[in-house]
């Protein structure tokens, strides 16, 4: 669990996301409150619940990105889902409890990676012994092994082909038990059941000495780890630090005077209620309590309003944050200031072909102007519009780059307008192309 202060969290998010101060502050406080709760003792720690967040704002302004970066920063298990993917229990489709099962799977992967790091040194030594076994055989004398070990460490044997035995963790058939709630809790993994009884399956792989190390280190790490301990730790991490991001929540809000699929929509909201409030979800690894999982929901709310959500669900999302639409200045800053801005990405991509790209200030202004105009006249898709515009502007250079090694292209406003100006003015055409 990271112990960044809210100010540090906001400045970290500023590296990747432009503007949206209110949303950044809300998620920073929510993350810091988790750390504060961890410092409490006993009963009070159980009583403190996370304050779930509802983000309201048009598409492409940074709702998803804020949550994704936040989870990375926290090193917490994070799962992003679309509310529209789920159906009411009893209907065909996924039920909302699957969200928590996915969260546990992600937590197990996270914990396993962390634990592998702890035993990496020991696993590396064991892997080296196995490479030596493959090179000189298990019965070789200590002198022979030592001489080969020196060659191995000097990199002299890197290209030599060897055969290694590794545990076979290939996909085994899954069987589902009919009538189980969620239809996934009853998944029986045959290799899980029979693996221990059969002593674990292995398979032979042919590879070079250099490439065998990562495979063998993973294999040896898993032998040194206690799988039950990993599962217990993952369940704890899911419960205490898990973050669930539910996008498109506005699409399951019953619209005023609407009809049709309203029942199923409302059903999904009702199924979400206990999850957000706090319930126990059965997973194949054990029960998971959702009381302290942080839920961040978001929606554009073009057609419906936040007040169209069920009152009970509104009450469980106490923190409301409105994200503003992007301005011309925001587009300029997105192109130039973010850590891996689109311009930096294209310059780096072209450098692989030994082609140099240079963008003038007026080109950046022109790109921002075109993106703002298109969002206003065609459809507002936020910052994603820049990708479409940039791709169109650099289409010719991208296509001919392999033949132009050593060349330098200066992109200025005139070049941008030449490539895209006419299309942007013709609204009917730009609807289809941009």
From Swiss-Prot:
Subcellular location as annotated: Cytoplasm
Protein name: ATP-dependent protease ATPase subunit HslU
Gene Ontology CC terms, in alphabetical order: HslUV protease complex
Keywords: ATP-binding, Chaperone, Cytoplasm, Nucleotide-binding
Any one of the GO BP annotations: protein unfolding
Subunit structure: A double ring-shaped homohexamer of HslV is capped on each side by a ring-shaped HslU homohexamer. The assembly of the HslU/HslV complex is dependent on binding of ATP.
Alphabetized GO MF terms: ATP binding; ATP hydrolysis activity; peptidase activity; proteasome-activating activity
HAMAP family (alphabetical): HslU
Family: Belongs to the ClpX chaperone family. HslU subfamily.
């Amino acid at each position: 669990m990271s112990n960044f202060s809210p100010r540090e969290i906001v400045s970290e998010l500023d590296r990747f996301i432009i503007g949206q101060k209110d949303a950044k502050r809300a998620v920073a406080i929510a993350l810091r409150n988790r750390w504060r709760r961890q410092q409490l003792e006993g009963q009070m720690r159980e009583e403190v619940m996370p304050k779930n967040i509802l983000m309201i704002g048009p598409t492409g302004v940074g709702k998803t990105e804020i949550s994704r970066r936040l989870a990375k920063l926290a090193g917490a298990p994070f799962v992003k889902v679309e509310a529209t993917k789920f159906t009411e229990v009893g209907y065909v489709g996924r039920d909302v409890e699957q969200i928590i099962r996915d969260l546990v799977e992600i937590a197990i992967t996270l914990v396993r990676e962390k634990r592998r790091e702890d035993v990496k040194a020991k696993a590396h030594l064991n892997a080296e012994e196995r490479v030596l076994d493959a090179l000189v055989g298990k019965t070789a004398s200590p002198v022979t092994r030592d001489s080969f070990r020196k060659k191995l460490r000097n990199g002299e044997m890197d290209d030599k082909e060897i055969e290694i035995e590794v545990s076979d963790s290939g996909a085994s058939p899954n069987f589902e038990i009919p009538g189980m709630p969620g239809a996934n809790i009853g998944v029986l993994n045959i290799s899980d059941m029979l693996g221990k009884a059969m002593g674990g399956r292995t398979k032979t792989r042919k590879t070079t000495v250099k490439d065998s190390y990562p495979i063998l280190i993973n294999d040896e790490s898993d032998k040194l780890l206690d799988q039950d301990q990993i599962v217990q730790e993952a369940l704890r991490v899911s419960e205490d630090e898990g973050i669930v991001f539910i996008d498109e929540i506005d699409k399951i809000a019953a619209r005023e005077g609407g009809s049709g699929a309203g029942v199923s929509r409302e059903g999904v909201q009702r199924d979400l209620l206990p999850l957000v409030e706090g319930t126990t979800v059965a997973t194949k690894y054990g029960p998971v309590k959702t009381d302290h999982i942080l839920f961040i929901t978001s929606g554009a709310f073009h057609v419906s309003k936040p007040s169209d959500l069920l009152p009970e669900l509104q009450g469980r999302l106490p923190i409301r944050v409105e994200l503003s639409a992007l301005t011309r200045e925001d587009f300029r800053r997105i192109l130039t200031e973010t850590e891996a801005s689109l311009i930096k990405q294209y310059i780096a991509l072209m450098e692989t072909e030994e082609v140099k790209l240079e963008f003038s200030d007026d080109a950046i202004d022109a790109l921002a102007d075109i993106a703002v105009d298109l969002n206003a006249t065609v459809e507002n898709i936020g910052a994603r519009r820049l990708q479409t515009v940039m791709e169109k502007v650099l289409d010719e250079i991208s296509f001919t780059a392999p033949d132009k090694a050593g060349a330098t292209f200066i992109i200025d406003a005139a070049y941008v307008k030449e490539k895209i100006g006419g299309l942007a003015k013709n609204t009917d055409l730009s609807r289809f192309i941009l």
